[in-house]
Each structure stands twice: as structure tokens, then as C-alpha cells.
Amino acid sequence: MQVILLDKIVHLGQVGDQVNVKSGFARNFLIPQGKAVMATKANIEHFEARRAELEATAAANLAAAQARAAEVTALGSVTIASKAGDEGRLFGAITTRDVAEAVTAAGVKIAKSEVRLPNGPIRTLGDHDVRFQLHGEVFAALDVIVVAE
């Protein structure tokens, strides 16, 4: 199925690209999320009229993500307190939701879907590196320090 991309999609294309994707991917994800429209003559003409507006929106989103990445990096580290046993293992785990809440409490609004825990949930005390994907091509890193309550 031919679609016109209205947003940059990682591993697929840039704004305005006409790409061929599987029908289910287009119907169930791209079109309902507003990331693409079907490539009909009317939609192609409509898109060409709106191309500058969509490219400006994409550039603004990228700039906002880069600014948020700079804020996250400026934090340096975030401390999370959790109940732990004698051997340094946590009762439970620190998940993406916990990290997002801690960073938001520190002053930078982060959604849990933007948090990347490379080794899965944090289950031990100490320093852990956490990455954030704020945009398709904007990443930030932060040191999360887990201490016992």
C-alpha cells in the first residue's frame, strides 16, 4: 500500500516520502496515529500544499526534543530511594515509570515511554545508566542512583 509520510518514521522515511508499506501497518498504525495518509491524487495535491507547514512542525519537534535532552543531561543524576535487603537487592524493581516520575520531580517532564532501561528493570542498589529517547533521533543519558530507604 502506498502512503505519504506526514512525520519522520525511523527506518521508513522522512516527511513527504511516498513509501510502500504492508496494508496492516498502514491501516492499524500509520494512518490512525496521523503519521501517514494514503497516496491518492487528491492527498498528494493536498500534501504538496501543506509540505512547508509539516516540515516546520517536524523541525520544531526536533528542536524541542534537543532542548529537553539538554535539560536531562544538565541534571547529571537522579536519586531514587527504595526498600532493599542486606545484600543490596531491591524488594521489587525500579521500572520506567519510577524513573520517569523521579526525573519529572527533578524538573524535566519525561514520559515513561521515553525511558530506555538497557538491562531491564533495576533490581540492585547503586549507580545505573539510563537512556532516554526523546525523539526518533534525539537521545539523552542520565545516571540514576538507587539508595536504600
UniProtKB/Swiss-Prot annotation:
Cellular component (GO) terms are: ribonucleoprotein complex; ribosome
**Which Pfam families does the UniProt record give?**
Ribosomal_L9_C, Ribosomal_L9_N
Q: Write down the SUPFAM superfamilies for this protein, in alphabetical order.
A: L9 N-domain-like, Ribosomal protein L9 C-domain
A single Gene Ontology molecular function, please?
A: structural constituent of ribosome
Q: What does UniProt give as the signal peptide span? A: none
User: Is Ribonucleoprotein given among the entry's keywords?
Assistant: yes
Biological process (GO), any one: translation
Q: What does the protein in this record do?
A: Binds to the 23S rRNA.
Q: Which HAMAP family match?
A: Ribosomal_bL9
Question: NCBIfam families recorded for this chain?
Answer: L9
Q: What is this protein called?
A: Large ribosomal subunit protein bL9
Coding gene? rplI
